[in-house]
Structure formats: structure tokens, C-alpha cells
């Protein structure tokens, strides 16, 4: 598995539905970019300018929401992931 560095988080992207509620099949270019996923790996945290380490708020297994323009898409061993900075995570699902 990939191990993020610093304040980065690796999220397994939750794929969007192929059909609408009414049963209409969506073309691949009509689907919106996913904005939800499960955290699969967390970096050690960022450091302040004076060397103090900031703890990570998110943890492995959290389901998170993020902006559709955030992060870097990565494919690893056939799976789609997103590498985000923790600050790009908008919310944790409870």
C-alpha cells in the first residue's frame, strides 16, 4: 500500500452511480467527479515553522467529503485513489 508523507491523506474514491434515480443510464462524460471517499492511509502530519508537529485529525477508515477539484488522482494496483492534503478535506462523516 502507498504511504503518504506530511499532511497528505490517501482516499479510496467512492464511484458515482451509473444510473439516475429514475433509471436513466448516464454517459461517462455526464457523471460528476466524486467528492466522497474512505481514508485508507494517513501521513505523519505537518510541521510548524518552529518544528512542532501538528497531529492529523482524520484517521484510516474515516469517510470524508472533499471539493471535486482537490487532490491528485492516482491509480495503484488497479484501484483509483485520491491524494489530498488534510486541509482539503471539508468534513468527516460520523
From Swiss-Prot:
Principal cellular location given in the protein's record: cytoplasm
Keyword Cytoplasm: yes
Xref: Gene3D superfamilies: GroES chaperonin
Biological processes, Gene Ontology terms: chaperone cofactor-dependent protein refolding
InterPro entries: Chaperonin_GroES, Chaperonin_GroES_sf, Chaprnonin_Cpn10_CS, GroES-like_sf
Keywords: Chaperone, Cytoplasm
One GO CC term on file: cytoplasm
Record GO terms (molecular function): ATP binding; metal ion binding; protein folding chaperone; protein-folding chaperone binding; unfolded protein binding
Domain of life of the source: Bacteria
Subcellular location: Cytoplasm
Family indicated by similarity: Belongs to the GroES chaperonin family.
Quaternary structure note: Heptamer of 7 subunits arranged in a ring. Interacts with the chaperonin GroEL.
Reported function: Together with the chaperonin GroEL, plays an essential role in assisting protein folding. The GroEL-GroES system forms a nano-cage that allows encapsulation of the non-native substrate proteins and provides a physical environment optimized to promote and accelerate protein folding. GroES binds to the apical surface of the GroEL ring, thereby capping the opening of the GroEL channel.
Protein name per the record: Co-chaperonin GroES
Organism field: Lactobacillus acidophilus (strain ATCC 700396 / NCK56 / N2 / NCFM)
Gene: groES
Amino acid at each position: 500500500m502507498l504511504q503518504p508523507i506530511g499532511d497528505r491523506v490517501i482516499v479510496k474514491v467512492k464511484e458515482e452511480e451509473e444510473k439516475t434515480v429514475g433509471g436513466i443510464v448516464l454517459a461517462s462524460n455526464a457523471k460528476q467527479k466524486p467528492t466522497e471517499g474512505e481514508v485508507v492511509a494517513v501521513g505523519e502530519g505537518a510541521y510548524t515553522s518552529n518544528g512542532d508537529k501538528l497531529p492529523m485529525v482524520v484517521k484510516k477508515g474515516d469517510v470524508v467529503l472533499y471539493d471535486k477539484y482537490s487532490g491528485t488522482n492516482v491509480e495503484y494496483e488497479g484501484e483509483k485513489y485520491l491524494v489530498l492534503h488534510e486541509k482539503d478535506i471539508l468534513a468527516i462523516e460520523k
